[in-house]
Amino acid sequence: QYFEWVDASREELFTEDPNDRRRLAGQVWYPAAASRSEARQPYLDFPERRLDMIAYQSGLPRFMITHMQRVQTNAVLNAPLLAQDQKTPVVLFSHGLSGMKNQNTIQAEMLASHGITVISVDHAYDAYLTIFADGSEADYRSSDTENRTGEAFLAFRSPQLNTRVADLVFVLNEIERRSDEND
């Protein structure tokens, strides 16, 4: 399952527009009822847009990664929840710099198959490419072109790390809020 939320309380660190608010796209893997008839999800959504960025970020020629667009996962979009007597534990996944929300799909699927819900967020502008439901994009803007070290590195990265932490706190709060509304 995919989600997209806006944290209206936070300005977007990575853009010049003071009216931009922090926008997040994410993906959830959860214990689901078995379904053989539903189409499995591809590993890459929007492969025609993602492959160029993956090639660029990894330093590989595009032809070496085009096979990724044919990879199918075990996930079924909006599959029915597996009936359980108790709430499932939740794991948050936060990709590394220039990563993506679904980079560890195989781990997320394995955890979900063992009764654990996994929530992953594309940290917009820290992910190599975030594609929102309306088709707009947040490209990677976290490069350190000056190769800073020590205090300069920390001064450069700290706002980004704080943004990532705030992203995860927002997602947890939003899940709790939505869960309370459904109880």
Describe these PLM feature segments:
Residues 1-91:
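Domain-level recognition of soluble alpha/beta enzyme cores
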Residues 125-183:
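Alpha/beta-hydrolase active-site loop
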Residues 71-88, 92-131:
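Short substrate-entry loop that stabilizes the transition state in hydrolases
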Residues 13-16, 101, 105-108, 117, ...:
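Generic detector of contiguous secondary-structure segments
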Residues 28, 111, 168:
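Divalent metal-coordination and catalytic microenvironments
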Residues 30, 113, 173-177:
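Residues at helix-coil transition
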Residues 25-27, 47-52, 114-117, 122, ...:
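Short, surface-exposed linear patches
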